[in-house]
């Protein structure tokens, strides 16, 4: 039986502010700047006008209302009883947009058949009914043009998912990261035959799962042709294009425009940190490697930060690495790029980790940016607290370059390594160009594209 028209208790517009999530680093930076600002001015000048107290009260009220709405939704209820009768706990504009019927969402391309900008501001629920299974049917007043007499249906599971979190989860929770050093890196579990990787979705899921967990895998028995790395990278996502091209050669050349194209030692670094969004995954496919030297080295920066968290001194340096920006740049061969980044980047969303001595300290760890060879050489006014930052980087670098942290291997022809470029640093020992040949082929994949592949394969991975 159809229920009467319902009202909606409108949240204050300021409620949108309560959903803005800041990383711990952003919060700490703002707190510090405010603290310095307060010290520099007379106390009387920092007294805020009463409007801020009113704003805070509205924020608290809106947050409480939103929490109550989520509780109602999580119970499978779209409407609650209010002073004036049934009240929809979701704004009617948002509820109208949530309709996924074939008239609203194209079944083939999964895109909207209308523009959300055309939803009338005065749209409202006209009638609603709920069947025995808890599913809702809703009709509308002042609906979109061309959608007269439209009926939207929402399943009970759909309604419950809206209350589960602010952003509904479409895949199973992500597996925990596994932190490693020289002694704990799971080499056997991180090595996969090429044909297993490209031969089936199950094989690909195993590689993607391990790459997510450890940030470093090896693919063996690959064809030794120049196009093989393109095919391999495409299993993870579209190739990331940079000024080096979709793929590039890593071998010693005269007059090199990048230290990677020399025979010299190349210390621990990450690639393209001077770009707006650096590639998160890098592939290096070995086509030839008969030179003396040229061993590849890898280290897990997350594990290094775990070791830093073991002492008060390390914790202090860790905080500095979160707060202080470092400038990276590339100005060569007609290219001009620069970017400022704190060494350690945090996320507002917790991420569990294994093989960590201090998991609580790392629960919000997101990315690390470390690339000393590609730092910007000129002084910058962003280099605040330069002595504290340098001391913190000394501390981090000492642990990073310790024998305990380093996994070393000499790539052989037909082997490809794939690693998380924003977690795992890589280095290369010097090699003798007169003793043989060394030729690697490289490619990148963006983090968002890899995450899409991960989500599509999640059901084939361990829970």
Locations of the language-model features?
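A positional/structural detector of protein chain ends, strongest at the extreme C-terminus
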Residues: 1-4, 461-463
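Motif-centric detector for short Cys/His coordination patterns
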Residues: 2-197
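Active-site environment of non-heme Fe oxygenases that use a 2-His-1-carboxylate facial triad
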Residues: 174-216, 221-463
């Amino acid at each position: 039986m159809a229920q009467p028209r319902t009202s909606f208790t409108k949240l204050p517009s300021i409620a949108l502010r309560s959903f803005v999530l800041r990383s711990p680093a952003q919060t700490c930076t703002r707190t510090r700047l405010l603290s310095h600002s307060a010290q520099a001015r007379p106390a009387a000048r920092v007294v805020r006008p009463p409007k801020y107290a009113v704003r805070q009260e509205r924020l608290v009220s809106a947050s409480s209302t939103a929490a109550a709405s989520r509780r109602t939704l999580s119970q499978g209820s779209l409407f609650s009883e209010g002073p004036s009768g049934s009240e929809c706990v979701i704004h009617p504009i948002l509820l109208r947009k949530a309709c996924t019927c074939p008239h609203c969402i194209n079944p083939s391309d999964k895109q909207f058949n209308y523009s959300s900008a055309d939803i009338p501001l005065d749209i409202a629920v006209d009638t609603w009914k709920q069947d025995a299974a808890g599913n809702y049917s809703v009709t509308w007043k002042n609906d979109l043009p061309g959608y007269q007499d439209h009926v939207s249906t929402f399943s009970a599971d759909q309604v419950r998912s809206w209350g589960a979190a602010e952003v509904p989860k479409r895949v199973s929770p992500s597996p925990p990261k596994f932190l490693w050093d020289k002694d704990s890196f799971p080499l056997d579990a991180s090595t996969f035959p090429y044909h297993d990787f490209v031969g089936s979705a199950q094989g690909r899921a195993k590689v993607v799962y391990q790459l997510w967990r450890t940030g470093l895998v090896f693919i063996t028995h690959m064809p030794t042709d120049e196009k093989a790395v393109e095919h391999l990278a495409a299993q993870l996502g579209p190739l990331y294009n940079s000024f080096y091209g979709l793929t590039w050669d890593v071998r010693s050349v005269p007059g090199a425009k990048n230290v990677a194209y020399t025979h010299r030692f190349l210390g621990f670094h990450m690639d393209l940190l001077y770009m707006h969004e650096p590639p998160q995954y890098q592939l290096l496919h070995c086509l030839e490697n008969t030179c003396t030297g040229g061993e590849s080295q890898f280290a897990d920066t997350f594990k290094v930060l775990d070791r830093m968290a073991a002492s008060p001194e390390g914790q202090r340096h860790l905080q500095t690495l979160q707060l202080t920006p470092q400038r990276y740049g590339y100005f060569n061969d007609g290219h001009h790029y620069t970017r400022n980044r704190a060494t350690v980047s945090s996320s507002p969303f917790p991420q569990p980790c294994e093989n960590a001595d201090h998991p609580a300290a790392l629960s919000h760890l997101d990315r690390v940016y470390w690339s000393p060879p590609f730092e910007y050489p000129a002084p910058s006014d962003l280099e605040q607290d330069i002595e504290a930052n340098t001391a913190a980087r000394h501390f981090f670098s000492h642990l990073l370059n310790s024998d305990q942290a380093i996994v070393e291997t000499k790539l052989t022809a037909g082997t490809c390594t794939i690693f998380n470029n924003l977690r795992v640093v890589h280095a290369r020992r010097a090699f003798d160009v007169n003793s043989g040949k060394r030729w690697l082929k490289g490619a990148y994949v963006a983090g968002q594209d890899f995450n899409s592949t991960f989500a599509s394969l999640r059901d084939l991975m361990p829970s």
